[in-house]
């Protein structure tokens, strides 16, 4: 009977130790955390704590991500409401509290980063050199900012749209997939940044205070060259965010990351095309383009020059580009270029059709 009891006890202990997230109690804490020589990230939680409940699925996923390296690092948790002596021993005053133990001493380091999977995984990897494993996910295009990086991210050459969020906030959770989609929509815009600050994390609270954040999510736009923000007060749909950014930054994105019919076009040159005779168009466009720094100004010059030699050039070239786009398979950057050039060609084709109608 004693042997069976011991066996059950051992099996229970083994189960606790080999689980993705190790359940720590006074009986095994010292052996697993303090004397093992193996570092550990430990969450001190209480079952009734709302923030703890929100963290629970993320923390379980974290344990799974490092389960392959259980001989190198431990992801553990302590019910500090039941085992209050353990909580008091390490100065736990609120829940959840996360602490990093080096496996050699009883003086842990407070974890002050974000409570999302990416932040927690990065912390463990930086400490141990161990990389997380799990279902392959496309890396997020949202730039995570904190107290150390925020000031360097705004006020420079980029337009920055920032969401100040908290992991326990229901509205923030609803916003998250839209925010990810928005970041993907603008991934090819080198000077537009979609960012996020975990305002509930220790390394994000100071920035949130400085920015006057009092509720979540709070969304602010920082124009390039300015550290003064513009509050975003519109709808929280992907389309609404895209419309806002297109207006503020001069981009032409659509839902899904494509380009609209104005992308690549230059209003002043379009007006010139509409008001200049075919005979004078090439010279007029070339002269006007010399004063422009726009990426596609010289493409206008090229098309106008080609048209002066072949009146069907724009129509034929447009048909060729549309065929390439319809076929698919081009790199995203190439698709952007094809759409922009097609939009420009349509300006010339429209003028050609009007000229033929007059004849």
Swiss-Prot record:
UniProt GO MF annotations: protein disulfide isomerase activity; unfolded protein binding
Position of sequence motif Prevents secretion from ER: 356-359
Chain positions of site Contributes to redox potential value: 50-51, 170-171
Catalysed reaction, written as an equation: Catalyzes the rearrangement of -S-S- bonds in proteins
E.C. no: 5.3.4.1
Origin superkingdom: Eukaryota
Keywords attached to this entry: Disulfide bond, Endoplasmic reticulum, Isomerase, Redox-active center, Repeat, Signal, Stress response
Disulfide bonds: 49-52, 169-172
Annotated ranges, domain Thioredoxin: 20-129, 131-250
Pfam families: ERp29, Thioredoxin
InterPro entries hit by this protein: ERp29_C, ERp29_C_sf, PDI, PDI_thioredoxin-like_dom, Thioredoxin-like_sf, Thioredoxin_CS, Thioredoxin_domain
Expression induction: By stress, and tunicamycin.
Family: Belongs to the protein disulfide isomerase family.
NCBIfam families: pdi_dom
Protein name: Protein disulfide-isomerase tigA
Source taxonomy: Eukaryota, Fungi, Dikarya, Ascomycota, Pezizomycotina
UniProt gene name: tigA
